[in-house]
Amino acid sequence: MTSIYHDDDDHLTASGKDLWSNFCVLVDAAVMLYEEEEEEQRRKIVSEEEEEFQKRIFCLFPRKTRSSLVKRQQNLIRVSTSSSLIDLNQFPTDSEIEDPQNHLQGLSSSCFIAANSETKTLQNPSSEPCSSLGLFGHKTAEYQKTETKDPPNPNFPCTMSLCLMENTSRKRRAVEQRKRSGGVKKANVAPFSQTARETPEWLVKVMTNMKEAKDAKLIFEKTLFVTDVNPTKNRLSMPFNNLLRNDFLTSVESIIINEDINNNNKIGVGAILVDQRCKKWGVMLKRWEMKKESGKGSWSYNLICGWNDIVEANRLKEGDNITLWSFRCCGILCFAMEQSSSSLALCLC
């Protein structure tokens, strides 16, 4: 068999061998693509089965419906500073739930009774505690001794309100302490007042002609520097500190930009730039760090890959004022560049 294959190889021409090699590569690629599609389909089926299983859980084990009054009363029991205010048998019955006002009155009266029983116990420590206090034993007796230092206020309908007011005042004091110590940091808010400008008419026409274009935002204004029009640089720098707003990227685009921070070969986000002559250019948006001699750096967005063509076509030069808008067309990031009147007139000549 080996000799037969060797004889066949001898008769094959060089072009035939190349064709056979390319065919093998194509077959391998097709097999890999088929396996990837099968794996993706299998994962999708598994995820759908898991989701369906989660839905069936609550069908087999329905959640128990509870009255809002019961939940509210249980929460009050947890935050109560007195362990003997409410008896364990004081939970509302069906009739009490139907008439919550009567039940609340009974609850308030039980609070007064419990408070009076505590006072009597403190005045006569040798006497036996009431039945409700006996449930808690020695711990309740110890707590009653400490409670004499701060007796309940009879002006309130129930000592539970004291607990709620104490928690509220405690939180308020904590907030005031953080403010005095400078622990509260204010978030950086984009100056949206500067962006309250009507969309230019030429941009409205461009978006209308492009179809499905929407969400125009004024994001950047700049007087061009020498580096912005230098052909060797081939970029427009947009420092973060000079951005009017920084919400023009989607979550996926932001992830791509952030992952490029530590990469030497940055991928960037592809975009379209439209000038006032309605001419479209393909550009790339990347994030760079501008390092200084002091060791500290500043971040900026940069429009590259085609910026030199835009500078040449629009005759941009140092000192020209430009305004940059962003919008979306079929989900694609787009920019619109508006020039100052003088540079635009020179460009149209």
From Swiss-Prot:
Do you know which InterPro entries this protein is assigned to?
At2g31720-like, B3_DNA-bd, DNA-bd_pseudobarrel_sf
Q: Which organism is it from?
A: Arabidopsis thaliana (Mouse-ear cress)
Enumerate the UniProt keywords alphabetically: DNA-binding, Nucleus, Transcription, Transcription regulation
Name of the protein this chain belongs to: B3 domain-containing protein At5g24050
Q: Which residues bind DNA?
A: 240-341
> Subcellular location, in the record's words?
Nucleus
Lineage, top ranks: Eukaryota, Viridiplantae, Streptophyta, Embryophyta, Tracheophyta
In the record, what terms sit under GO molecular function?
DNA binding
Give the CC-aspect GO terms. nucleus
The domain of life for this entry's organism is Eukaryota
